[in-house]
Design a protein with these regions (language model features):
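Alpha-helix C-cap/termination motif
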Residues: 53-55, 93-97, 142
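Metal-dependent phosphoester-hydrolase catalytic domains
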Residues: 3-5, 32-36, 93, 113-202
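Internal, well-ordered alpha-helical segments in soluble enzyme and binding-protein domains
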Residues: 21, 83-90, 135
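Active-site beta-strand/loop signature of hydrolases that rely on acidic residues for catalysis
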Residues: 1, 61, 87-115, 147, ...
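Structured beta-strand-rich core segments of catalytic domains in phosphoester-bond hydrolases
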Residues: 1-71
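Surface-exposed cleft-lining segments at the edges of enzyme active sites
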Residues: 38, 66-85, 120-124
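Soluble or luminal CAZymes and related metallo-dependent hydrolases
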Residues: 42, 79-87, 128-131, 172
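Catalytic metal-binding/acid-base residues of hydrolase active sites
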Residues: 65-67, 108-110, 152
Length: 202
């Protein structure tokens, strides 16, 4: 906190020690910080939201960490589906009140075949299963745009590489971290890039 404060950033964190956690860090004043947007039956630290003012409009920021869901034949997968359903329900409500929303974080969703190095090996994975991808598209259909795909229609853009089997060196990655924004905010965005430098040092 002190490091961010020394650089004039305001930070809000919702975490579980050694487990889940989300945060919002901003140079603009944050208001209406919430960690109770959805009904999470396991009460895990997976979502935080805050409002900022931009050109006299309120923009809602939502940072998420969606459950992984693997293995698919366990309660972990059911939890992921329920969690995503609760998020979609909340987005429907939020979208009616505010048409300026930025939803970002680790979605643990591979949206399409071009978003993973070997799609066949993930066909029955909780990150790529059809019903999970449908839930992701349901979010988009609420009036959101996938910012990376908006600027890069077919370009590879991995955000995660496993720490085993030389995944980084082989570029065996996947795109599971996303920025979804209300469509009317797209004209406020100039570009989007994935910073691979921190991962290259691990």
């Amino acid at each position: 906190y002190d490091d961010f404060s020394s650089m004039d950033y305001e930070s809000h964190v919702f975490g579980q020690k050694s487990y889940n956690g989300v945060a919002i860090i901003s140079k603009k004043k944050l208001k209406n910080v919430r960690t109770d947007l959805i009904k999470d039956k396991l009460k895990q630290s997976r979502i935080i939201s805050a409002d900022i003012e931009y050109k006299k409009k309120i923009v809602q920021l939502i940072n998420i960490y969606t459950p992984n869901g693997n293995p698919v034949d366990t309660e972990k997968y059911d939890y992921k589906k329920n969690w995503m359903d609760q998020l979609i329900k909340q987005l429907k409500t939020s979208s009616k009140k505010n048409s300026n929303i930025i939803l970002a974080g680790d979605f643990n969703v591979i949206p399409a075949a071009e978003d993973v190095y070997n799609v066949k090996s993930f066909e029955d994975d909780a990150l790529y299963r059809l019903e999970i991808r449908k839930k992701f598209r349901e979010m988009l259909n609420l009036g959101f745009s996938d910012v990376y795909r908006h600027f890069n229609e077919s370009k590879e853009g991995y955000t995660f590489w496993d720490y085993m089997r030389g995944a980084w060196q082989k570029n065996n990655g996947m795109r599971i971290d996303h920025f979804l924004v209300s469509t009317n905010l797209l004209n406020k965005i100039d570009d989007i890039n994935i910073n691979k430098k921190p991962r290259s040092k691990l």
